[in-house]
UniProtKB/Swiss-Prot annotation:
UniProt function note: This protein binds specifically to 23S rRNA; its binding is stimulated by other ribosomal proteins, e.g. L4, L17, and L20. It is important during the early stages of 50S assembly. It makes multiple contacts with different domains of the 23S rRNA in the assembled 50S subunit and ribosome. The globular domain of the protein is located near the polypeptide exit tunnel on the outside of the subunit, while an extended beta-hairpin is found that lines the wall of the exit tunnel in the center of the 70S ribosome.
MF GO annotations: rRNA binding; structural constituent of ribosome
Gene (name only): rplV
Xref: InterPro entries: Ribosomal_uL22, Ribosomal_uL22_bac/chlpt-type, Ribosomal_uL22_bac/org-type, Ribosomal_uL22_CS, Ribosomal_uL22_sf
Descriptive protein name: Large ribosomal subunit protein uL22
Any GO BP: translation
């Protein structure tokens, strides 16, 4: 197999998608607390891409802007690298991991200080064709034997 035939895949893509069609995008070190970002991500998980984008566009949460940008990026990756149609894409995986926390100090009365935790998030979204997602749900999971 020549180098032009071989398709380079990252380890991250292997863990998120395996050999199935789809694309992903992530925003790392986003200045949003993970709890607030998870509220927004939970709204779009499993939705068709167009519906999820319209939902995010008018969502009042501050995290919805960042999630919107990540979803747009994932759709663009699917269209350009995979050649998939935007209309039949579904948000199959949506996860928010905790990033590093920046510690800051706020002066208080009588010479004291309290700590402020400025939390960050790693937001990852995976888009796949609807038929692949439906097929994945239809296959039964293997049970662990004791």
């Amino acid at each position: 197999m020549s180098t032009t035939e071989r398709r380079r895949t990252s380890a991250r893509r292997e863990t998120l998608l395996g050999d199935q069609p789809g694309a992903f995008a992530s925003a790392r070190y986003a200045r949003i607390t993970p709890m607030k970002a998870r509220r927004v991500v939970d709204m779009v998980r499993g939705l068709p891409v167009d519906e999820a984008l319209s939902l995010l566009q008018f969502a009042p949460q501050s995290a919805s802007e960042t999630v919107y940008k990540v979803l747009e990026s994932a759709v663009a990756n699917a269209e350009l690298t995979e050649g998939l149609e935007r209309g039949d894409l579904v948000v199959s995986v949506a996860q928010v991991d905790e990033g590093p926390t920046m510690k800051r100090w706020r002066p208080r009365a009588q010479g004291r200080a309290t700590r402020i935790n400025k939390r960050t998030s790693h937001i990852t979204l995976v888009v796949q064709p609807a038929d692949v997602v439906a097929e994945k749900k239809a296959t039964p999971k293997k049970r662990k034997s004791a």
